[in-house]
């Protein structure tokens, strides 16, 4: 189920404050955040936001195509590890 339109998008207050400060100052320094559940809003376009994935900070450059998505979508938390390839075939 999606979020109600009347509530509006969720964005952490500290992240929103930092984005507004960066836009006002004109600096393009990466903003670090743990808030993976925050929605990307149009005010963030052009900024780089470093999202924590539990181990490292993943830099995400915000473009117009990313508006409406969540920050956590672009910082994967799980690493894919495939099974070892066993070439032990009987009869060769």
Curated annotation (Swiss-Prot):
Ribonucleoprotein recorded as keyword: yes
GO molecular function: rRNA binding; structural constituent of ribosome
Top-level division of the source organism's lineage: Bacteria
Keywords: Ribonucleoprotein, Ribosomal protein, RNA-binding, rRNA-binding
Keyword Hydrolase found: no
InterPro entries associated with the record: Ribosomal_uS19, Ribosomal_uS19_bac-type, Ribosomal_uS19_CS, Ribosomal_uS19_SF
Gene Ontology biological process terms in this record: ribosomal small subunit assembly; translation
Any one cellular-component term (Gene Ontology): small ribosomal subunit
Function recorded in the entry: Protein S19 forms a complex with S13 that binds strongly to the 16S ribosomal RNA.
Family that this chain belongs to: Belongs to the universal ribosomal protein uS19 family.
Name the record gives this protein: Small ribosomal subunit protein uS19
Gene encoding the protein: rpsS
